[in-house]
């Protein structure tokens, strides 16, 4: 599993010109599911993200987590995180999970991170054409990948 985690002052998802979901201070998580991901990958990522110490403390050091600041999460599925553009100019997506599997795993990930984070969790709509807006804070952007399997 691969995610792009962005610290935001606000973020939202619109679909067809209509606001679908939004958060204030917190994290926007773009989540990609690979064809090899398992429940272990989802659990690892669900524990990692809410505990990342990427928010500044009173001394200006990145020392506080989403849980510490009482922030929110906006989680958006994004299969293009597994794009491979190493050959040619048109990316391939063979590492991405097929849509049927990705939908199931994405839904499980959202439920797991809701449980782990203990904060408001909003989402986009799996497979929809979404417009994602954000005000990146910092900017702080972290790319996470679940540990490789032996």
UniProtKB/Swiss-Prot annotation:
Tell me what this protein is called: D-aminoacyl-tRNA deacylase
Gene from which this protein is expressed: dtd
Q: Name one GO biological process term.
A: D-amino acid catabolic process
* Purpose: An aminoacyl-tRNA editing enzyme that deacylates mischarged D-aminoacyl-tRNAs. Also deacylates mischarged glycyl-tRNA(Ala), protecting cells against glycine mischarging by AlaRS. Acts via tRNA-based rather than protein-based catalysis; rejects L-amino acids rather than detecting D-amino acids in the active site. By recycling D-aminoacyl-tRNA to D-amino acids and free tRNA molecules, this enzyme counteracts the toxicity associated with the formation of D-aminoacyl-tRNA entities in vivo and helps enforce protein L-homochirality.
| Keyword Transferase among record annotations | no
- Give EC number(s), comma-separated: 3.1.1.96
- Motif (Gly-cisPro motif, important for rejection of L-amino acids) on chain: 138-139
- Catalysed reactions listed for this entry: glycyl-tRNA(Ala) + H2O = tRNA(Ala) + glycine + H(+); a D-aminoacyl-tRNA + H2O = a tRNA + a D-alpha-amino acid + H(+)
